[in-house]
């Protein structure tokens, strides 16, 4: 299963760990979207930045 992740808030003033989590998800700019495989590594990073992103499941 895949998920679509969209960065909805900017990175200014955010913790370094949150910035690293977003970089590992491939998100750098606001409103950027990525389609990722649903696996434990991705879900762990999403948990760290759940307040900055919007997540949807895709088929």
Swiss-Prot record:
Classification via InterPro entries: Ribo_uL30_ferredoxin-like_sf (IPR036919), Ribosomal_uL30_bac-type (IPR005996), Ribosomal_uL30_ferredoxin-like (IPR016082)
Transport found in the keyword field: no
Pfam families in alphabetical order: Ribosomal_L30
One cellular component (GO) term of this entry: cytosolic large ribosomal subunit
Any one Gene Ontology molecular-function term assigned to this protein's record: structural constituent of ribosome
Keywords: Ribonucleoprotein, Ribosomal protein
NCBIfam families: rpmD_bact (TIGR01308)
Family indicated by similarity: Belongs to the universal ribosomal protein uL30 family.
UniProt subunit comment: Part of the 50S ribosomal subunit.
PANTHER family linked to this entry: LARGE RIBOSOMAL SUBUNIT PROTEIN UL30M, MITOCHONDRIAL RIBOSOMAL PROTEIN L30
Name the record gives this protein: Large ribosomal subunit protein uL30
Native species: Sulfurihydrogenibium sp. (strain YO3AOP1)
Gene behind this protein: rpmD
């Amino acid at each position: 299963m895949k998920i679509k992740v969209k960065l909805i808030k900017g990175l200014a003033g955010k913790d370094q760990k949150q910035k690293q989590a977003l970089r590992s998800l491939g998100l750098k700019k606001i409103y950027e979207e990525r389609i990722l495989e649903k696996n434990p590594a991705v879900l762990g990073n999403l948990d760290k930045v759940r307040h900055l992103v919007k997540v949807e499941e895709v088929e």
